Amino acid sequence: MFRSMIVRSASPVKQGLLRRGFASESVPDRKVVILGAAGGIGQPLSLLMKLNPLVSSLSLYDIANTPGVAADVGHINTRSQVSGYMGDDDLGKALEGADLVIIPAGVPRKPGMTRDDLFNINAGIVKNLSIAIAKYCPQALVNMISNPVNSTVPIAAEIFKKAGTYDEKKLFGVTTLDVVRARTFYAGKSDVNVAEVNVPVVGGHAGITILPLFSQASPQANLSDDLIRALTKRTQDGGTEVVEAKAGKGSATLSMAYAGALFADACLKGLNGVPNVVECSFVQSTITELPFFASKVRLGKNGVEEVLDLGPLSDFEKEGLEALKAELKSSIEKGIKFANQ
């Protein structure tokens, strides 16, 4: 969660915004790059990262319309300096010196589409962007939002391996929206404050590969087995719920931007040495037989400091864990195969 912060010189209105935002006063300079900054997720994500005082330089890149987004966001009176870059020739300039690269680039879901339907378009985009990251900012942390995350993270890993720059501690699939949804849905059925809720979500980032661990939720609430099953299903189908509600006019752009900003903030805190920063993310992992898996990870100055064990699972969660493995394995292999074509 974002921690409250107080900027003594801020106006009351600005203080109100920032208390709901991020953290800290005296912090190192950090350059954050958003690839796909002019898109449905990229624009609100750019706004949220502009509000984050951990960011000193905000570099916005897209294939079109980035100058306008940069000019708009750049007028906001917060710490970071904003630069806009557009087109292939500017990609290197956008990336140079980055501490953190966030990738929401690609096409959004439409009604009837699954995340895997996006593969043929978004896989190529992620491959090309990963080649550029390996060339211009190989030491940066990379937060992958572009779907299908279960495949795009392995694509990026393979591209980085080919370039000789791969560091498994620095590549993250952003699954935070699954956690955000699980928290919201759980609180809605429990007599608890949603701001105090935490629910680990493990596995992957599509359909049945999303496995919320409601047995480990805090604060604990006495929910029936049927309700836990319903909450699990709703968490898994949360993206589809939004796509259908928008009736062809978009996907989960605003909540995804919020979740992406949450995870980016956690990564920046880790880089800055804040202790005990733990978030769920889809990373290279040995906690199952699969090469990538989403679970709780401890973040630090080098990215992933520790991949945490799954902890005790209910019988329902154990069943879900076994059920998701085949689909997740297939998605991972699909990404690896694409990257090596």
Swiss-Prot record:
One of the record's GO cellular component terms: cytosol
CDD domains on file: MDH_glyoxysomal_mitochondrial
Family: Belongs to the LDH/MDH superfamily. MDH type 1 family.
PROSITE patterns: MDH
Organism (species): Arabidopsis thaliana
Purpose: Catalyzes a reversible NAD-dependent dehydrogenase reaction involved in central metabolism and redox homeostasis between organelle compartments. Required for carbon dioxide and energy partitioning in leaves. May limit photorespiration during the dark phase. Can convert 2-ketoglutarate to L-2-hydroxyglutarate in vitro.
Enzyme active site: 205 (proton acceptor)
Descriptive protein name: Malate dehydrogenase 2, mitochondrial
GO biological process terms, semicolon-separated: malate metabolic process; tricarboxylic acid cycle
NCBIfam families: MDH_euk_gproteo
Species classification: Eukaryota, Viridiplantae, Streptophyta, Embryophyta, Tracheophyta
Subcellular localization, as worded in the UniProt entry: Mitochondrion matrix
Reported tissue expression: Expressed in rosette leaves at low levels.
